[in-house]
């Protein structure tokens, strides 16, 4: 029995070695098997920290995830990602390098690529068509050196699936489209920590999530979000210059469910009509602002509000109070009461 167990574990060891026999000696490879009797396998390859002199690196033919981060790579050529094994990539991590230039066809062979991480590099621009034909669903361009960005770069990618784009913590003063008539399916756009002074015009983009935290926006005009009628979550936190939100700024956001206006210390007052049109809003964060107490008429603009945060220790919630039944007048009209956990305050 003992000999059989030894043979069994020996065979397992040989199988594991065989599964990663094409793994580069400086990389770490992990095989994942799927299907009946593990008939299908994919390999995750970690080639981070191997140094710039070792790229491009040969990888197993069934590689699905490749990590090339932290290699001090300065550029991506047309041939660097075109060797055997690269065409099956689903996920590619090029973060935390020194990449300042990417050739126009650098990703052209990666026809299955869904996730691309280019964060923490030195990129200032990207060539038109660099994402042509890619089925990307997630792209991280955060912590680079972009000063302006043309979203039309994404019109040439495969449009079947929505994409999440992270451009946070760059140097952006402008984000725009030159051809708003072309379809552009971006689901989530992260623009936090940039230098935008106004709400960007994002016409023709069916965004559901938008983050503008930590920009230099000083005022938000009436109708600033009129083109973003499908927004579900909007974050406008930490706008150190924000002093004014005009009435009707959110008037077209009938699908918005969560609005974050926290940490805007210069925002002193809010006209009740600022919240007009927010008929689906359920969560509102006003913590660390100076706009409390709020007028009762504010809540009339938000019939579906469920939760309001007014400070670190002040959280409000709406309770539906069923009216009592009276023999003479029948069922009394129910009331919605907003209760705050600050000394039992009721607004």
From Swiss-Prot:
GO CC entries: extracellular matrix; extracellular space
- Name the PANTHER family on file: AGAP008170-PA, INSULIN-LIKE GROWTH FACTOR-BINDING PROTEIN COMPLEX ACID LABILE SUBUNIT
- Which keywords does UniProt give here? Developmental protein, Glycoprotein, Leucine-rich repeat, Repeat, Secreted, Signal
Q: Where are the transmembrane segments?
A: none
Repeat region (LRR), residues: 62-83, 88-109, 112-133, 135-156, 160-175, 185-205, 206-227, 230-252, 255-277, 280-301
Q: Where is the LRRNT domain?
A: 20-61
Glycosylated where?
285
Q: How does it assemble?
A: Forms a ternary complex with chordin/CHRD and BMP4.
- SMART domains given in the database record: LRR_TYP
Q: Which Pfam families match?
A: LRR_8
Q: What is this protein called?
A: Tsukushi
Q: Where is the signal peptide?
A: 1-19
Provide the function of this protein: Contributes to various developmental events through its interactions with multiple signaling pathways. Dorsalizing factor which functions as an inhibitor of bone morphogenetic proteins during gastrulation.
Name a biological process GO annotation: growth plate cartilage chondrocyte development
Q: State any further remark.
A: This factor is named 'Tsukushi' because its expression pattern in chick embryos is similar to the shape of the Japanese horsetail plant, tsukushi.
Which positions form S-S bridges? none
């Amino acid at each position: 029995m003992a000999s059989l167990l030894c043979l069994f574990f020996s065979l397992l060891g040989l199988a594991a070695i065989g599964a990663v026999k094409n793994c580069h000696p400086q990389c770490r490879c992990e095989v994942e098997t799927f299907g009946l009797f593990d008939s299908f396998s994919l390999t995750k390859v970690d080639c981070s920290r191997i140094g710039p002199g070792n790229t491009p690196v040969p990888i197993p033919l069934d590689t699905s995830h490749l990590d090339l981060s932290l290699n001090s790579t300065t550029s991506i050529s047309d041939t660097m990602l075109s060797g055997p094994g690269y065409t099956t990539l689903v996920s590619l991590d090029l973060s935390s390098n020194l990449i300042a230039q990417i050739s126009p066809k650098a990703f052209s062979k990666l026809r299955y690529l869904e996730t691309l991480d280019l964060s923490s590099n030195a990129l200032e621009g990207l060539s038109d068509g660099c994402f042509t034909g890619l089925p990307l669903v997630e792209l991280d361009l955060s912590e680079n050196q972009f000063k302006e960005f043309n979203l039309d770069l994404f019109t040439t990618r495969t449009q079947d699936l929505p994409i999440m784009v992270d451009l946070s913590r760059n140097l952006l003063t402008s984000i725009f489209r030159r051809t708003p008539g072309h379809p552009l399916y971006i689901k989530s756009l992260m623009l936090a920590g940039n230098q935008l002074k106004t709400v960007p015009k994002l016409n023709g983009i069916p965004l559901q999530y938008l983050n503008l935290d930590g920009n230099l926006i000083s005022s938000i005009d009436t109708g600033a979000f009129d083109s973003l009628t499908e927004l579900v979550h909007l974050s406008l936190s930490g706008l150190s210059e924000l002093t004014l939100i005009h009435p009707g700024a959110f008037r077209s956001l009938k699908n918005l469910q969560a609005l974050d206006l926290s940490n805007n210390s210069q925002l002193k007052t809010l006209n009740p009509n600022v919240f007009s049109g927010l008929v689906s809003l359920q969560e509102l964060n006003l913590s660390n602002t100076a706009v409390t107490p709020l007028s009762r008429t504010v809540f009339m603009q938000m019939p579906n509000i469920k939760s309001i945060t007014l400070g670190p220790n002040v959280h409000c919630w709406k309770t539906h109070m069923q009216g009592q039944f009276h023999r003479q007048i029948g069922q009394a009209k129910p009331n919605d009461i907003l209760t705050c956990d600050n000394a039992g305050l009721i607004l």
